[in-house]
Amino acid sequence: MTIVNLAAYHFVSLDANEQWRPLVTARCNELGLRGTILLAPEGINLFIAGTREATDAFIAYIRHDPLFEGKFATLQFKESLSDSQPFRRMLVRLKREIITMKKPAIKPELGRAPFVDARTLKAWLDRGHDDAGRPVVMLDTRNAFEVDVGTFDNALDYRIDKFSEFPEVIDANRADLEGKTVVSFCTGGIRCEKAAIHMKEIGIDNVYQLEGGILKYFEEVGGAHYHGDCFVFDYRTALNPQLQPTENVTCFACRAVVTPEAQQSPSYVPGKSCPACAQAASAA
């Protein structure tokens, strides 16, 4: 059976999340969906999967049900397919932020961050500069272990371990960004949008987010100016520029990404250990 995987987020002011939670949970269970939906005062973030019929019904529900007062009417979804269900259960969770930066919540009514679409970005990277002639800096806002699976060519990578470290890292390295066009990017768009807003707030000019993140870029233009795959937070571990699962796996013990080459190591025991585990043990 083909399973449809949906990902979406939207920054919008929400104040009825506690009332919505049981109703959204019930509807998802009725449809046989699995995954996670996060609701916070600053918006919604979701990763769900199910049959085509179920996911189509969910999209209609979240966009048009009177319960939501039109707040999700323009919610855009990124879609991929898999042969099996990547999630074990259905969760609707209430959070302070839909992506944790430990900064005051975004004020959606003030407008979203400036963005650049995939085709325009590719044209900039082909030329080596943006439409105004400024050099383009690609800024990876993901965690270090995600970056190691794949990233844009010559991207800035500050080796953060969690997104809440981003503001401090940017404060310490803003000289790298001054006088350039900065394009922040992440898997699906949520971290790079929040990152772009933060950079604008602290006075860094010419900042954009990559619309839809890496996955939308793959969908629109493939893997141009990108090397490797894109880490995803489900059983597939990583997707290639054709949005197909790769042979990378996640170590059950330490959650490290194990490449096909690393799977040949004697230290790799499926479900038990990997070379990263062995390295950590030897360093202890």
Curated annotation (Swiss-Prot):
Q: Does the keyword Cell division apply?
A: no
Q: Which residues form a coiled coil?
A: none
Q: Which reaction does it catalyse?
A: uridine(34) in tRNA + AH2 + O2 = 5-hydroxyuridine(34) in tRNA + A + H2O
Query: What's the EC number here?
Result: 1.14.-.-
InterPro entries from the entry? Rhodanese-like_dom, Rhodanese-like_dom_sf, TrhO, TRHO_N
Report the top EC class in one word.
Answer: oxidoreductase
Q: List cystine links.
A: none
Domain of life, per the record? Bacteria
| Keyword list, A-Z | Oxidoreductase, tRNA processing
GO function term, MF aspect, one: oxidoreductase activity, acting on paired donors, with incorporation or reduction of molecular oxygen
Output the GO biological process annotations, alphabetical, semicolon-separated.
Answer: tRNA modification
Instruction: Give the positions the UniProt entry annotates as the active site.
Output: 186
Q: Which residues form the Rhodanese domain?
A: 132-226
- Role: Catalyzes oxygen-dependent 5-hydroxyuridine (ho5U) modification at position 34 in tRNAs.
The family assignment reads:
Belongs to the TrhO family.
- Please give the name of this protein: tRNA uridine(34) hydroxylase
